[in-house]
Amino acid sequence: NVGGKLTVSVQAKLNGQWYKYNDFTIFVSEHPLDEWGVTYRRIAPGYEVYSALGIYQRDLSNFDEFSIFDNKDFYGMCLNCHTPNKTNPEQFVFHVRGALGATMIQQNGKREWLQARNDALGGAMVYPYWHPSGKYCAFSTNQTHQAFHIGMEKRIEVFDQASDVFVYNVETHEMVVDTLLSGKDTWENVPVFSPDGKTMYFISAQKHDYPLQYKEVKYNLCSIAFDADTGTFGNKV
């Protein structure tokens, strides 16, 4: 189909009657795809089985699959949240969960392994997001758990018993923290930088008794200014 086209016809049966929609065409480029195209975590469907999973990359030009990290090399622990900087594999971060876990930051051909948790963090470095400059990477620190419902209408509830947000300076190896992002009575989570890097977005919820009050938890979408030159946050959320 290289350089050709595909015509798609769509029909639907609604209230016992068939309807035909307008055909549309997919044009196939004559130019080959670049060598690499997509990375992903591959895990069996289910809620609790993670003994065999890995982070993989697929060559979209021929559909070949290659392993980046396989958890057989990490004593079967869970691998998650692999995040390149704007799809650039030269800057790459991922997290290994568990008692022997760590967070790996790759840049300039070197890898830095960070302790997964300590007293200053209060939880594991879980959900990352790169600053567009590549100088910083924002993380949430989460104490994540899951519970199963006994009713038929719901199956599983994944929840945090604590979570904060901070920024890591990958050049100086320093943490940028602020009490506005680590409240004792609030849970901050999933930080994201704006495209210009001047704002960091995140979600925040009031602390509740989990899992008993899981229905009461409501997250707000918040933002705070960020100065990449000084590595400081604004004074207002």
Task: Map each language-model feature to its residues.
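Beta-strand-enriched, solvent-exposed domains that form extended recognition/catalytic surfaces
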Residues: 1-29
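Conserved, compact domain cores that house catalytic/ligand-binding motifs in diverse enzymes
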Residues: 36-115
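Short, conserved, GDST-rich strand-edge loop motifs in beta-rich repeat architectures
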Residues: 36-50, 139-161, 203-218
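Multi-bladed beta-propeller domains
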Residues: 61-77, 106-124, 167-187, 225-237
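Beta-rich catalytic cores
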Residues: 78-80, 124-126, 161, 187-189, ...
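Conserved beta-strand position repeated across blades of beta-propeller domains
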Residues: 83-85, 129, 192
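Residue-level detector of Asp-centered blade-edge/turn motifs that repeat once per structural unit
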Residues: 86-88, 132-133, 195-196
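Hydrophobic beta-strand positions that form the internal "hydrophobic ladder"
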Residues: 91-92, 134-137, 200
